[in-house]
């Protein structure tokens, strides 16, 4: 059910009858003031200008063509040029039956079904995931859930950083410090590897003999040396084992089978370079292989060069990304590829896409989207870091949130048993972190605030979760089985009508996220829905209405609200709580 689309379709068809050459899109928005209508045509003045008909006269022509349709209660003109639309209560009641009986809340599948690759999370090996990985991981996962809900074939791609010079450095350091036995016996944790990586990097930058040895190990690894490959596999295994624990804690759907890291594409790189040279897209210059792109200019106005193979025959990220793109299109048959990386990767991705298209590795019809995102900031509006200036580890952030949530619940419910306290603390703590991030527009930076994200007021996970538990409690107290309520919902009060319309907006929200990858729209919707229910609860007696029909109607409307909240949170990867 998409009310805006139905209104838009009606008005556009009317405009075609008024003028057969009509080709302009009608924009429908939700009214900010309910007394002016439920919906509004936002661009009537532009349309009237193009059709050379005065706004009011155009309104009259449209009105004659659509006013008798079942959906409309009242359609009025507002100066200087707006159409305000009121929806019939009876029509709303009839349409609420669809989400009531449907497990999908009446949301239709999208056809044709498309193959969509979503590139997200992408942690580095031998390094702990930090707060910078949170946004890519959870925003990407919401997009996966939404598109799968709409019936699309989604291919998750966890493009891990598991190849390159850093592995030669790590192997050399582990050998020098006699740490390989510990590694083989699983006595080194990911935290140990993270520290080892930092120390080995310092040694690589300051010790020429060590850096030479590291480069030799890189070459051996690239040539498939068994000794180096065994160490490399162990490093990958230790890292990803910990990362999967974080994914599970975050309720993220990434699994081992979704990992397609840099190493996966490494065997393809020599052929890519040779083919680009053969097609005369790439040239050799000073021992390196470079692609010069006229589409990108440097400060001097010259075509920018993208190096795809270094003088030492080593490959770069750009080479890997070209091979990756070719594989996703030709082997995975992708119709659309979405990348969840920060804004700094934008030019790099555009260059890789341009080269792949020039080489005919991909079709011009392939949809390539970079869903970039901003940074998590501290209250002083600087990158969110520890007091000593280090990047905050994601596992530490999640544990801190669980501890804070547990303490908060314990203060509110001191008699709660330990088992329930631990379970509630984990659900609310993880939900608070996820929702706090997901509720912000991904294109912007946002300030991380413990107090706000764990608050039971405002647009937060605890507020939405509490709204859900309150409705579940009301339904239990009603003692009226929902399957026995055969009557349609009766809508008389303004708060009932507003809640009904908001429930029916669910599909519209789903489609917007599927198109733009912006989960903050769902968060805003769930907050509004919960707030509308609160107004309904305050203004309408649910359990104690004298008329049994009204009582049943309001219980049914309450159930529909809870059902919608649960589905919305589920698509955000956030768990609901039946009792809080």
From Swiss-Prot:
Chain positions of motif 'HIGH' region: 123-133
Gene Ontology terms, MF aspect: arginine-tRNA ligase activity; ATP binding
Keyword Ion transport: no
One Pfam family here: DALR_1
Alphabetized PROSITE patterns for the sequence: AA_TRNA_LIGASE_I
Listed CDD domains: Anticodon_Ia_Arg, ArgRS_core
Keyword terms of this UniProt record: Aminoacyl-tRNA synthetase, ATP-binding, Cytoplasm, Ligase, Nucleotide-binding, Protein biosynthesis
Superkingdom: Bacteria
Protein name per UniProt: Arginine--tRNA ligase
Subcellular location per the Swiss-Prot or TrEMBL entry: Cytoplasm
Primary localization class, coarse: cytoplasm
The UniProt record lists the keyword Nucleotide-binding: yes
Catalyzed reaction equations: tRNA(Arg) + L-arginine + ATP = L-arginyl-tRNA(Arg) + AMP + diphosphate
Subunit structure: Monomer.
GO cellular component: cytoplasm
Family per similarity comment: Belongs to the class-I aminoacyl-tRNA synthetase family.
Organism listed in the record: Buchnera aphidicola subsp. Schizaphis graminum (strain Sg)
UniProt EC number: 6.1.1.19
